[in-house]
């Protein structure tokens, strides 16, 4: 699909005429997002984000549209791009653009377009800069930090090590040629970032450890009501949705290999087992491996599993978990996909030399020299968003309620000294607040402690109920 832009408008989407359809789905999603909508209702009058200019880099879906409109309802000015080339829902992007929010996203972007769009979320039409980032995977944060370094040392962007870096480095060089101080100027204006996902959080901690991070960050991913719900229950529903839409395969009876048994892997394994697959798990961490074994999954290595599996799902956040040699040994018609954030969990670059036959968008047959074919979904990128529509609205409500609270927290405390440069998590009482708001939709009835019971276990009657180190 060719992207369409109206030069009189500050947006770029696939088809603005899809806005009506998108608006109808947004209205439905709002009814399934109780936590986020309650936050909107609670804070709308106070306008706690007034003055915030948020550069957003997160999957441009229907659920994200509800997040964007919540941020705006609380006073923020917002510009948006997707954090994945395949994850945009074009009708969602159209609805947001039609509503007056600058959005630069369409399904099936090239990598050149992706990095161009990520730059555009920092270019306010009045010539100003954003002062907050809402990130998913850390690309927006990375862009400013790397670009600012490259202003002083061009060698940092001289030798790309991957296709992704080739386009990223080229985009930075192009921007520097036009405006040599663009990155440092934008970087200096940012008061904080809230990060959505595990991969982006890893990047933040690495940057902080090296002393490279230039502004405070809130790790939204490790809020319990994000990681233990979005990552687990969201993947439990959206993984199989993506595989089914892409292939129409019967999962029952198949051997399914789940690489990684963190929260995403746990949800993925549950989903595949629920449809009667034989689920095998690969793990490096003995604790996670023991958890998998105690749940009845067979724990194996990828070297062993490669020639046995029918469906392969990577969820590790690591690099080359499935290699060329693994794929060369797979069965004919094996299905290979990823539900981790980046596309390098599967070594796609190593098989690009072979014949690719597109069955339909984001579904490819790759023919090996011996004539065997395997099915690659979403070119190794997020299968649930590339081949389906991602997590359900209800579970995203928890994640995005946390995002909104984190944006409010950083913006309100920007001058207080509460958050010097570093990586932080939201306090337990806010986690519990999000859970309470979500429970309303399910007609759940919480038991209340008596004063005596609260005193007996040493907590306040209204919570928080667990210590920060508690593992849910």
From Swiss-Prot:
Binds 1 NAD(+) per subunit. Keywords: Cytoplasm, Hydrolase, NAD, One-carbon metabolism. It is found in: Cytoplasm. It catalyses: S-adenosyl-L-homocysteine + H2O = L-homocysteine + adenosine. It is an enzyme of class 3 (hydrolase). Pfam families: AdoHcyase (PF05221), AdoHcyase_NAD (PF00670). GO terms for cellular component: cytosol. Its main location: cytoplasm. NAD(+) binds at residues 197-199, 231, 260-265, 283, 318, 339-341, 384. InterPro entries: Adenosylhomocyst_ase-like_sf, Adenosylhomocysteinase-like, Ado_hCys_hydrolase_NAD-bd, NAD(P)-bd_dom_sf, S-Ado-L-homoCys_hydrolase_CS. Substrate binds at residues 61, 136, 196, 226, 230. May play a key role in the regulation of the intracellular concentration of adenosylhomocysteine. This is Adenosylhomocysteinase. It comes from Cupriavidus pinatubonensis (strain JMP 134 / LMG 1197) (Cupriavidus necator (strain JMP 134)). The gene is ahcY.
């Amino acid at each position: 699909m060719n992207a369409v832009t109206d030069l009189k408008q500050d947006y770029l989407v696939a088809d603005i005429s899809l806005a009506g359809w998108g608006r109808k789905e947004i209205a439905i999603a709002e009814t399934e997002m109780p936590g986020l909508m309650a936050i909107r209702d609670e804070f709308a009058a106070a306008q706690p984000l007034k003055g915030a200019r948020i550069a957003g880099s997160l999957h441009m879906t229907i659920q994200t549209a509800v997040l964007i409109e919540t941020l705006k309802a609380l006073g923020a000015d917002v510009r948006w791009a997707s954090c994945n080339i395949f994850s945009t829902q074009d009708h969602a992007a159209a609805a947001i653009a039609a509503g007056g929010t600058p959005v630069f996203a369409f399904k099936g972007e090239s990598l050149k377009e992706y990095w161009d769009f990520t730059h555009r979320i920092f270019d306010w039409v009045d010539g100003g800069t954003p002062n907050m980032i809402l990130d998913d995977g850390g690309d927006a944060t990375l862009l400013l930090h790397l670009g600012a370094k490259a202003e002083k040392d061009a060698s940092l962007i001289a030798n790309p090590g991957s296709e992704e870096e080739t386009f990223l480095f080229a985009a930075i060089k192009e921007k520097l040629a036009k405006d040599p101080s663009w990155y440092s100027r934008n970087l200096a204006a940012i008061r904080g970032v809230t990060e959505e996902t595990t991969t982006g959080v890893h990047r933040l901690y690495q940057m902080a450890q090296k002393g490279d991070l230039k502004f405070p960050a809130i790790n939204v991913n490790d809020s319990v009501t994000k990681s233990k719900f979005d990552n687990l229950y969201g993947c439990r529903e959206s993984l199989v949705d993506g595989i089914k839409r892409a292939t129409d395969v019967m999962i029952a009876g198949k051997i399914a290999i789940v690489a990684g048994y963190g929260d995403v892997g746990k949800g993925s394994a549950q989903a595949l087992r629920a449809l009667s697959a034989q689920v095998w798990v690969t793990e490096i961490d003995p604790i996670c491996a023991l958890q998998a074994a105690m749940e009845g999954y067979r724990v194996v290595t990828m070297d062993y599993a490669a020639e046995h599996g029918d469906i392969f799902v990577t969820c590790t956040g690591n690099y080359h978990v499935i290699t060329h040699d693994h794929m060369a040994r797979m069965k004919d018609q094996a299905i290979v996909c990823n539900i981790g954030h980046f596309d390098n969990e599967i070594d796609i670059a190593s098989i690009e030399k072979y014949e690719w036959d597109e069955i339909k968008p984001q579904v490819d047959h790759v023919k090996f020299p011996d004539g065997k074919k395997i099915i690659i979904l979403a070119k190794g990128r997020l299968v649930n968003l590339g081949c389906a529509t991602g997590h359900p609205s209800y579970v995203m409500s928890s994640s995005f309620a946390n995002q909104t609270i984190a944006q409010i927290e950083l913006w309100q405390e920007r001058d207080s000294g509460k958050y010097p440069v570093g990586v932080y998590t939201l306090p337990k009482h806010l986690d519990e607040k999000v859970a309470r708001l979500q429970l309303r939709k399910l007609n759940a009835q919480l038991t209340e402690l008596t004063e005596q019971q609260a005193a007996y276990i040493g907590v306040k009657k209204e919570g928080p109920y667990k210590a920060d180190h508690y593992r849910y």
